[in-house]
Structures are given as structure tokens and as C-alpha cells.
Design a protein with these regions (language model features):
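Residue-identity detector for glycine
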Residues: 4, 40, 82, 110-112, ...
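Conserved SAM/SAH cofactor-binding pocket of Class I
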Residues: 93-140
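SAM-dependent Rossmann-like transferase core, predominantly class I methyltransferases
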Residues: 54, 58-105, 117-118
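Catalytic cores of large soluble enzymes that bind and process phosphate-bearing ligands
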Residues: 47, 78, 82, 134
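N-terminal auxiliary segments of SAM/dcSAM-dependent transferases
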Residues: 1-76
Length: 140
């Protein structure tokens, strides 16, 4: 992506600024939402939930090879970099505890409709997840 260091886990794909034009190639609907900030740098309106949804689709495709991701309207849209950060720190804890069991099996209670932790954990670390939620809209 672009230069500009963020303070995320060193293994994170999200330690640099987004290349929005490149991401918009993966999700063309995102392109019409690209704007310039006062410094003339491409960005998006992060307060617009539809734009964040489109950005997430682009990030999941670009970094995690996920070709399809959908979310019911009115559901929370997780910020992917922060969720990936959490997964990387979980991996550090497992490594520090010298967990040798393979494969790693994780129970995600309250996974939500996005399934974001299972998506990132299985993509980056090849972990297995059982994801549960009590909200029928999240499960459908």
C-alpha cells in the first residue's frame, strides 16, 4: 500500500495508509466515494457506514482473498485493521505459551454477522473456528 506507519501489530497488513485507488479496483462501487483530504491525499468518509462496508469488502478481497462478504443492513461494521491486530496478538500469546496443538481450534462466542475474527484467523494463521451467536439475523 502506501507509506505512513500506523501503530498496529508488526505482522499486520494494515501498517500503512490505504491505497484507495487500488482497493477501488477490487470493489468498483468504492471509487465514487473517494475524496481528497485537506492535504490532497485520497480518503473516504469513515462516518458513512456504506462506505466503510465497501472498504471492508475491498480489504477482505485484497488482503485475505475473500471473494464474497456480505452483512445485513443495520449490523455493526467492524474496522478490519483493529480486528486483525487482535488476531495477531492472540497468535503472539499462543506462541508465548508454546501451544503446539495443531490445528488451533477457537470458539468465537458472539461472532456477529461479519464473522470477522474467523475470517482473519483462518486466512492468516489457518486456525479453525466455531462461531456462535444468539442473533438469528447474524446467523442467517
Amino acid at each position: 500500500m502506501k507509506t505512513g506507519t500506523l501503530k498496529l501489530h508488526p505482522n499486520s497488513y494494515h501498517n500503512t495508509s490505504y491505497d484507495f485507488k487500488s482497493l477501488a479496483k477490487n470493489v468498483p462501487e468504492l471509487e465514487k466515494h473517494l475524496i481528497k483530504n485537506p492535504a490532497g491525499i485520497d480518503t473516504v468518509d469513515f462516518s458513512n457506514s456504506n462506505v466503510v462496508y465497501l472498504l471492508n469488502k475491498a480489504l477482505l478481497l485484497h488482503f485475505y482473498n475473500l471473494n464474497f462478504w456480505d452483512l445485513p443492513k443495520n449490523n455493526l461494521i467492524p474496522p478490519i485493521p483493529g480486528r486483525a491486530d487482535y488476531i495477531h496478538y492472540m497468535a503472539d500469546l499462543l506462541k508465548a505459551d508454546k501451544i503446539k496443538t495443531k490445528p488451533i481450534n477457537i470458539l468465537d462466542i458472539g461472532t456477529g454477522a461479519s464473522l470477522i475474527y474467523p475470517i482473519i484467523g483462518s486466512s492468516v494463521y489457518d486456525w479453525n473456528f466455531v462461531a456462535v451467536d444468539i442473533d438469528s439475523k447474524s446467523i442467517d
